Amino acid sequence: MEQKRNDSIDFAKGFLMIFVILGHIVQGTIEDGNLRGVIYSFHMPLFLFISGYMINLNKLIAQPVKDVFSKYWNRMLKAWLLAYVIFTSYLLLREPTIISVIGLTYSPWGHLWYVPTLFLYILLCKFLFGKTNLIVSYSVLILLGIAWNYVIQTTSINVSHWFDCSKLPYFALGLYFRNHLNSEKFNKPYIVAPLLYVPLYFAFVSLPFKTFGLGTALLLVGVIILYFYPALKNDTMPKSKVLSYIGKNSLYVYLWHQAPILLLVNYVSECNLTYYYIISFALLFLFILYIKLRKVA
């Protein structure tokens, strides 16, 4: 019997995808504490929580590495590679310098970090949970996230984003909620509390939006525990055909939404920021209207 699709996961991904787009449209730095900073404080952490929540560890561990590569090549890596080549080529054509070549080789541009990072998270979890016990596996994920954030916070090292472990705690949290929340040994409060709070604290205090501090971290984990996780598990999130459609196609929306924004930033915002916002939000409105008018929506 075919398992019913969880519409709440699609809704959540679509909802967060709108904020991903808004976060890239809004100009300014995250440190300014403006709307962009608020958006960045929750949209990618929750996206990574969902990504971890969608992983079935037993199936992942049982699959040969070759099959894992094949599965994710068709599911996301092939589409990502095309986007990476096109965006990188465009950026190098605009600035054909050796510094640009080195920079874009060392670390992918903008939003292109997510897919390779997610794939490496998955491979790491396959190895850890397949070779070690739960305590060791989760400890490694947490400590790796903490160590990565410590380096970012205390040194001037420009860490590559091909494998960005700074957000690993959120992925691990989703993984835990999906696969081990009902495990007796992990339901003990003195084990669960550090798993939930400590990694998120270290993640928040070292990221660009660290000014939101511990309060934001605890607020976000509270939202996850009290609403986000129960709503995903019980499929009780609001129904929206438009957001669900965006959620189902979130990979392609994520990979290509930056194309018009990048062109507008390069050719419009430098001349007239008002025109930039008018065109950007008009395009976003037309995108949503197009989905609304489609029969599949």
PLM regions and their residue ranges:
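Alpha-helical transmembrane segments
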Residues: 10-21, 78-86, 138-144, 192-198, ...
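Short juxtamembrane and helix-loop transition motifs at transmembrane-helix boundaries
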Residues: 31, 94-106, 121-129, 149-156, ...
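Solvent-exposed interhelical
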Residues: 122-144, 176-194, 272-275
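Alpha-helical transmembrane segments and terminal signal-anchor/GPI-anchor hydrophobic tails
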Residues: 153, 157, 164, 182-244, ...
